[in-house]
Amino acid sequence: MSTLAIIFALVIEQWRPLGERKSVSAALAGWATSLERAFNGGERRHGMVAWLVAVLPPVIVAAVLYWLLSAVSGILALAFDVAVLYLTLGFRQFSHYFTDIQLAIKAGDIDRARTLLEQWRGASGVVRSREEVIRLSIEEALVAAHRHVFGVLLWYLILPGPSGAILYRLAAYLAARWKPVGSFGNFAARAFHLLEWPAVRLTAASFALVGDFENAVFCWRTQARTWSDSDTGIVLAAGAGAMGVRLGMPVQEVDGMQARNELGTGDDADGPFLDTTVGMLWRALVLWVAVLAGAAIVSAITRIAT
């Protein structure tokens, strides 16, 4: 049933995408802000309480509701799974930026590509070169695919019903939202890091399996630890190695030059690597679905045989 829910959610999202989910984002932002105001006393334990209040109720409610629906009808439980996955999972949550940048690069409109990248990453006021625009766009796409697709899938499969998908997306949101708040945000960051530990490694392994395996594993093992955020570094290093492209490297930001180590091996980022990125992400997703479908078939055959 999990495989069917994933397939249905992805198909519906491709047919009728929810885009950036602005209404959902606005509701989450208001909720996170109100919790911060209510609980933030400047200590780590206050952040822990706020995180538990924010995350546990929806996760528990989702698990209980799924259990109740399963007791009534498998179809209702499946529909609930699909509905939640539709809100939490999918390429179309971020791919419009990447696709528009891809089209702008192909059309030779570097100014539009720069503008789109600024909207995606946040304004920096820096005039970037064509190679920088392509390189940073690929980095954003790899991380976004992990956060919006593969990480969600893993935790959906681990916990009952759609509760894992809700847990992962809420944890990711709160970690980013409360990051600037000092010690109050420490627990959210730590909790998300724990959820990311298996997720980033499975995403990296997926990239390796559908790309250049040896390069991906080499870059993962030797380069990921040099990145400022080791979780993100694993995804970027494995993705860059799998595609044979050079990512990372220092970039100019509003507050000065940001030192970043080189990730990947091979060629400088150029237009064709945008297509390569899309192909690798889709192959990785197909791999996940194929493995899940195969496991479901084997399980069904085993039950019939016994």
In which residue ranges do the predicted regions lie?
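Hydrophobic N-terminal alpha-helices or hydrophobic patches in metabolic proteins across all domains
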Residues: 1-306
